[in-house]
Amino acid sequence: MHIMEGFLPWQWCLVWWIIAIPFIVMGVLELRKLLKQDREYLPLLGVCGAFIFILSALKLPSVTGSCSHPTGTGLSVMCFKPYITAVIGFVVLLFQALLLAHGGLSTLGANMVSMAIGGPIVGYLVYKLLKNTSVIYLSRSSALQP
């Protein structure tokens, strides 16, 4: 769920921005390096951004009276790793704040840490952990049978 504009005191907004900025910088550096090697990644970057934008714009009602939504960063993090996904997430969250009023500019740092940095890092770690695991083993271990 996006943190709305004006919800956080300015001191906390600053703290979240200080945490988010290094990820954006590292992501931009990795993105520049990737695109210098091969510009063919541009369409895939666009698809990942569109996927995140569409999926995170879907609202699912929750019991508490607010709503939740998937972020869709898993696809991007499997293709481009966490730093580049942070840049894609930043662009998506910026567009959502400006066009859909989901979140705000002052709370963009906090929204980034939760949706464009934290989630993708966890997703990437799970992906790396399970990447070489057999599909049959995973399906057996995830089956809900007594």
Predicted segment positions?
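Membrane-water interface at transmembrane helix exits
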Residues: 28-32, 55, 60, 96, ...
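Membrane-helix interface "capping/anchor" motifs
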Residues: 33-36, 77-87, 133-136
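Short helix-perturbing small/polar motifs within transmembrane alpha-helices
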Residues: 115-146
